[in-house]
């Protein structure tokens, strides 16, 4: 049953995080630079880095609440924060090669798959 609460907390947090990210894109519209998304990515990275060690020490806070904040709210606000936190965790745990490969593979792979998606999506529009 506790897992159900965690799912609900993550879903609600994700909805709020996504809504907050959308609000930032309205406040800071794209004019030569995606300020809203840039702010969400860097702000979310800071928030996840700041809150994770605090939440780990707070044993009185239920796991569902912790996951709702980190995976849900901040993850919904920006997936960049989770990627950055996972990379840092790998490096801190001595997995220098794995962390470095994960970093490079995620960035280059992400860019490559976005480009592939654009190409395939454009083909579908011209047929």
From Swiss-Prot:
A GO term, aspect molecular function:
metal ion binding
How does it sit in the bilayer? Answer: Multi-pass membrane protein
- Give the record's keywords alphabetically: Cell membrane, Ion channel, Ion transport, Membrane, Metal-binding, Sodium, Transmembrane, Transmembrane helix, Transport
Notes on how activity is controlled: Na(+) is not transported, but it plays an essential structural role and its presence is essential for fluoride channel function.
**Where is Na(+) annotated to bind?**
75, 78
Query: Which PANTHER family does the record cross-reference, listed alphabetically?
Result: FLUORIDE EXPORT PROTEIN 1-RELATED (PTHR28259:SF1)
| Purpose of the protein | Fluoride-specific ion channel. Important for reducing fluoride concentration in the cell, thus reducing its toxicity.
This protein's name: Fluoride-specific ion channel FluC 1
Q: From what organism does this protein derive? A: Shouchella clausii (strain KSM-K16) (Alkalihalobacillus clausii)
């Amino acid at each position: 049953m506790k897992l159900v609460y965690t799912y609900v907390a993550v879903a609600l947090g994700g909805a709020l995080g996504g809504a907050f990210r959308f609000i930032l894109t309205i406040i800071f519209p794209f004019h030569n630079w995606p300020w809203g998304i840039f702010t969400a990515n860097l702000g979310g990275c800071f928030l996840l880095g700041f809150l994770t060690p605090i939440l780990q020490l707070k044993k009185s806070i239920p796991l569902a609440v912790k996951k709702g904040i980190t995976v849900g709210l901040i993850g919904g606000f920006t997936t960049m924060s989770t990627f950055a936190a996972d990379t840092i965790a790998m490096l801190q745990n001595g997995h220098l090669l794995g962390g470095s490969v994960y970093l490079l593979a995620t960035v280059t792979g992400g860019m490559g798959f976005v480009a592939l998606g654009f190409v395939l999506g454009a083909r579908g529009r011209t047929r």
